[in-house]
Every structure is written in C-alpha cells, then in structure tokens.
Amino acid sequence: MTFRNCVAVDLGASSGRVMLARYERECRSLTLREIHRFNNGLHSQNGYVTWNVDSLESAIRLGLNKVCEEGIRIDSIGIDTWGVDFVLLDQQGQRVGLPVAYRDSRSNGLMAQAQQQLGKRDIYQRSGIQFLPFNTLYQLRALTEQQPELIPHIAHALLMPDYFSYRLTGKMNWEYTNATTTQLVNINSDDWDESLLAWSGANKAWFGRPTHPGNVIGHWICPQGNEIPVVAVASHDTASAVIASPLNGSRAAYLSSGTWSLMGFESQTPFTNDTALAANITNEGGAEGRYRVLKNIMGLWLLQRVLQERQINDLPALIAATQALPACRFIINPNDDRFINPEAMCSEIQAACRETAQPIPESDAELAQLRGEDFSQLHIVGGGCQNTLLNQLCADACGIRVIAGPVEASTLGNIGIQLMTLDELNNVDDFRQVVSTTANLTTFTPNPDSEIAHYVAQLHSTRQTKELCA
C-alpha cells in the first residue's frame, strides 16, 4: 500500500487545529486525525483589537512537533486562515506595528470615502470584490493615515497564512485566493491593482505577485532534521472549504458555515455587472482559475458571542430548546454593521428586535438571479453544518435540498491541494470524488409547511406587492 501523510494547519477566527491526513493511493481513501486543537480570539492591545500571532505560531509548531515525535514521515504541510488581515515586516523580517484584526474599528468610514473618491463602480470592476468595511484596502488606508511613522520601516506586507508559512520556511509568498479578499487584486490581471494600492497608501514593493495554489513555498525543518515541503494551498479558508464541497452539477450551491458563513457557487467567469454590484456579490479567487461567486453572511459569530456572554457551554441543549420555540417571532439582520463587534451582543440583538423595519433575506435568490438559474441543492460545509436545526431551517427557507458535510471542509480542501501538488490526484473534481466517498454527508429535505417557509413566502409576496405599487 502507498500512503501519503499531509498536515493541514487550519486557523479560524475562534479556533485553530493541526490535522494529519493519511491518503491511501490504491483505494483512494482519506482519513483525518486531529493532532492539536487550540483557541483563537480577539485581544485588546494599545487601543487596537488584535490577533496573538505569537501564540498561534507556537501552537502550530507544537502540533507539527507532535506529528514528528510519533515518528510519522510528513510529505507536506499547508496553512489556511481567514482573509483580509495582514502582518507588516521590516527588511530583516521583524514585525512592524501590531497584527490588527478586521473587527477593529480603525477603518470605519473609509469604505464610503473610497467610493466617493474612486467611484464605487470603478472599484468593483477593478477588483470584483464585495464592499465590506474591513477589507484590506481600507485597513491599509487606516494604517497609512493613522500611523504614518510606521511607513519608513515597512518592507513587506504578508497576509495571515503567508505570514505563518514564512515563519516556517523563511520564504515569502502571496497566495492568490487569499489575496483576492483584500479588494486590491485586479480581476483581469490577477496582480495587485496599482490605482487601488495608491489609494490605500501602501507601496506596491510591499507585495509580490500573487501565486496560484499548488506551488511549494519552501521547507520546514523538523526537529529530526527532515526538510518538509510547505505548499501554497488555497490559503483562504473558504477557498479550501469550497474545494472540499462535493458539488455535483451546475445547479449546486455551497454554504461554508462557521464564524462567517459564505454562500455562493463556482464559475469559470466573474460577475461584475450592475446586478452583481447592487447585490454586493463578490468574485473571490478559487483553485484552477475558478471564481467563488458568493455573498458574505454574518454566520455563527452572533451565536458565539451570545454563548460567551451568557456563559453557555451546552450548545446541543440550547439548540433543542430553541427547536421547541415558535419560529420567526423575532427577525434581525445579522449582516448589519452593528453586529460586527458590539460591546455586548445580547444587548445589541435586543435593541435590534425593538426596531420595526424588517429586511428581506434573499441571498440565495440574488445568486440565482445572477446566474439565471435556480439552485437545486445546497451543500453546507464547515463546523456550522453540525447544527441540525440550522441545516433544516436553511432547507425550509431556501426550498431546496440541503446536504450537510464535510465538517472539516477547510482542512480537507487544504489537504486536497497538497495531494494534487504531490501528484496523487489530478484536479479538484477528482478530489471531490474522494470526499464524496469518504465524508459523512447528511441530507435535509425542505418542508414547505414549516413556519419559516411560510414566513419567507410572505416576505416575498409583500415585496412583490410593494414593487407593483411603486
């Protein structure tokens, strides 16, 4: 039997994990084993909301060392993280300033300023990326305006996964799928857009040309002295999750469910027309030149904050209690900027419930309208797919079949690119066949008589009436 041992480092906004994958070539079987899991979270430092990158690096090294201590030969390593955030380095590779998190308020108001000065349509047609107030474009503008004293010391700007790969290998890389989340990459050239960089105040010399997934960045030398390749995987965690989504057919959509939830479909071409702009659709880079056409949804962030504030540890019990309650009594818009990082999430939700205006949730409809074809099934992947209540609500609200799983989608997609780089698999579609036969998948059938299905139908009926009367 021929085996490959690949290690995936998967960092999320609330936790990180080092996972060992064992791939058996002859039977095309893939098994995962968790080596090390650790917490991640926001910290307050010198008036900024930051990440503790030193702690994360220590946890990564601890996990890698554990694998080596077991005497396992590692064939490759890959790292994926969340998007938009970055670390600045000087000429000697030492950090400049703080690793500020996207939930910090430093970039507030700068998105509107960019739209006014550059033109909203022009920014969108250049980047194809949705407008979010914490995109790297605005974070860099905040940095260069508010901390100009740092600029003479900056030689490099590395996005989070590239920074940790650099710490392991000493080699710098700017991976394409994650680079596109910055709103700084030109959608036509796949290189940094000079006009957008100029507005941000950043120097183009801080960045190298983005590279597509599948190249070896460098090597990590393990304690035993072996040189292990570190692969540039699809380093944006959602890009990795989409690779592991067992999409079947052109009418399949995906929902990567975690702290953030991202709903969309794959396309060979981007969508940057006025309809896409009006719906704030994003065209993030994917593997093999594909685009991840999607919408950002606030996801489980609100739930995570409520659990923390109320000190609730038994999530299954809470879900069971919630399932017994009537649906749609209180509706809020979780994508409202007020929920990005409020001081007290519970109080903010209560305040929103007191307001009367209710938004119409229609991410699936906007995506379907963009394609000109309805979806027939929705693949929910990531940690959030373990929430059976949420899965059923999605099926009922969208009116289509939901297939939940795999849970560790980002990890699996990370491993998939490594196996392709090692010439064990041909392409993404080949890897998805492996996922389909090895992952635990659960199907949820929509219930048209559910309360939420009736509520969504009523909302759409109300909207159509308003459009007729306008």
UniProtKB/Swiss-Prot annotation:
Ion transport among keywords: no
GO molecular function, one term: glycerol kinase activity
GO biological process: glycerol metabolic process; rhamnose catabolic process
InterPro entries found in the cross-reference section: ATPase_NBD (IPR043129), FGGY_C (IPR018485), FGGY_N (IPR018484), Rhamnulokinase (IPR013449)
Pathway: Carbohydrate degradation; L-rhamnose degradation; glycerone phosphate from L-rhamnose: step 2/3
Disulfide bonds: C68-C222, C394-C398
Catalytic residues (UniProt): D237 (proton acceptor)
Keywords per UniProt: ATP-binding, Disulfide bond, Kinase, Magnesium, Nucleotide-binding, Rhamnose metabolism, Transferase
Cofactor(s) the record lists: Mg(2+)
Residues that, per the record, bind substrate: G83, H236, D237, T238, N296
Stored Pfam families: FGGY_C (PF02782), FGGY_N (PF00370)
UniProt xrefs under NCBIfam families: PRK10640.1, rhamnulo_kin
Database matches in HAMAP family: Rhamnulokinase (MF_01535)
Protein name, entry field: Rhamnulokinase
Species assigned in the record: Shigella boydii serotype 4 (strain Sb227)
Gene: rhaB
